[in-house]
Amino acid sequence: MHIVSIGCNNERMEKMKKLIISIVGIVLTCCVTAQQDIRKPGLPLEERAQMILDMLTLDEKLGMMEHRNPAVERLGIPAYSWWNEALHGVARNGFATVYPMPTALAATFDDKSVQEMFGMVADEARMKYFRSQRAGQYDDYAGLTFFTPNINIFRDPRWGRGMETYGEDPYLTARMGTACVNGLQQQVNGYYKAMACIKHFAVHSGPEADRHSFDAVVSGRALWTTYLPAFKYIVKHTDVGMVMCGYNRLNGVPCCTNEHLLVDILQNLWGYNGLFVTDCWALNDCWERDTVIPRHETHATAAAAAAAAFGSVVDLECGSGLPALKEAVEQGLIPISMIDAHVLKILKARLSLGMLEPEQPFNTIPDTTLFEKKALEMAQKSIVLLQNKDNILPLQPEKYKSIAIIGPNAADSAMLCGNYNGTPYHAVTLYEGVLKYVNTLPENQRPQIYFDTACHHVDGHYRLPRDFDKQIADCDLVIFVGGLSPELEGEELKVEMEGFHGGDRTSINLPRIQEDMLKRIKKMGKPIVFVLCSGGAVALDWEDENLDALLAAWYGGQAAGTAVADVLFGKINPSGKLPVTFYSTKNYIPPFDNYEMEHRTYRFMTEEPLYPFGYGLSYTDFRYSDFSFDAGQQLFYCRITNTGKRDGDEVAQLYMTNKNDDRGPVKTLVGFERVHIPAGETVVVTFAVDSEFFHTYIDEYQRFEKRSGFFLFRCGDQEMEIYL
């Protein structure tokens, strides 16, 4: 009996083994078949996305709604992080090309070059993505979906993150943001190179220290005429892949749970159908009770906040709210059909980037020398010549036996890179740029260079060598490189010192220690060229009156030093224009937390600023003439002649005043075109003005209406009044 029993057990075990092997084989076959199915590039994108969705479990679906998507190995879907940065080059992902910050890019008024630049950013991103995939690395910052551009309005010069934006004007911001989106989202053979995200929707521009609890209270007029136009323009003119909602509240409601903002306006009115993503951990501000950081506290629980966001149109959370999302689903606060709709959009986005193809698209290595050339070109075009007394610039090296280069930003390579940046292989500081240029000159024309930082940006005392005064006295010219630093202004910084708080500025003046140093040098009777590095406007009243030349060089990226030297010595004719107003210390600026637009920016200022929006000098002169309007084609024309002796670029700017709107802007930019004009030659610039500029906002009805009346147009020193 015992022997028979063993034999029967062996027989059963053998059958069981065969059954298990058979089941495993079937499962493996199904998995392989499923993987083959989702990797069929011939199927329509929508069909493939739906097929994958149908294979997912609920937990797998929910996992895709957090920015760190876990892998679904049984279907061959790799892990992926949606959080990647490319504000002015691929960021936080090792060595990469660092282009100028967005305020500097805006100063070029060259959206064509900005689009080319972001096309190169997409190329570099693909290169890095391909390498990460090969290495099995799926961390944050290694992907293709970029939380850029920042198209908030730089409404106040004190905002620390203003340097991430394209300035204070809605139309300039819209054009530059469009260039960024189209550059990143180049489409080849049906696949996007990368995906852009316009942020922060909406009405988001400080204060940084209070951003997790701040309520931006704005009128309908300010909302619709200043804060929303750039978003609307990009949604209407591009296929932008993502929109990010901001941390702040808008008129009492957190942006990421704001149905009026996200559903009524963005989705229903404008027809946006891309992905909605939260700012990182923004939903936590809705429910967390924090004794250290004040928060909105608008929802009782994390699940309630998740339901308010995902139960509406938010598809993806940058954060760690998966448990709350799951709880909201289990409580019946979010229907499964809505989860399916969100995940379907997420899958379509990944498929549109070619992420699930057997062979990754765009896997060839581009010519990276083009990236370096473009970084230099953009830095050169961004520099704004603010003052040039007695045409001291361009410098003639043979006139100077020795030149002193001093100031806290003279040899600071980190400053050049701004924030949200990559690590350049080599950043040329302004000191290095000047030294390098001088060393190319014949020995008999080569001035000696003396260098010292001389002072800090803000705090501390002078740390001068004993022979500092003698060295300056022996020099024929001083180049002072000062201004601000991303260590002082930026996103939610832990900075508390004179003139700075939490990443924002409390004063628009140049830090006192730098002005004191300039006054000390001025007393020595030396000509001074001041190179300002900053993310935005600085009040330079004393400097404008007392110094010989002023340049705004922004945070100019890895090639800033070379670009500044090229402008100082005349290799490049400066052509940048201010994307922000440079206020005088005499100008009134409303309280920082007031989001209404009266007295703000060139559009609503009635006082004279120190340097106006759109201002910038050149080493040549331009004459405007024959300003005309073709009523049939609705086009404006203007002739521009280079009357100087040097070739140069000019930015023709068209401004409009709506005389039917008593509360409207004093003037507003409605067109611009950057043109190259050789010495002595003339070009004709053509402007096509968007018809929406001819609509008047009616406060009584909280909407725009087309009302006939007079409109004043200006281009250079030319103007005309038209009845439309």
Where are these regions (language model features)?
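Bacterial Sec-dependent N-terminal signal peptides
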Residues: 1-36
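Glycoside hydrolase catalytic-domain context in secreted enzymes
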Residues: 31-696, 700-721
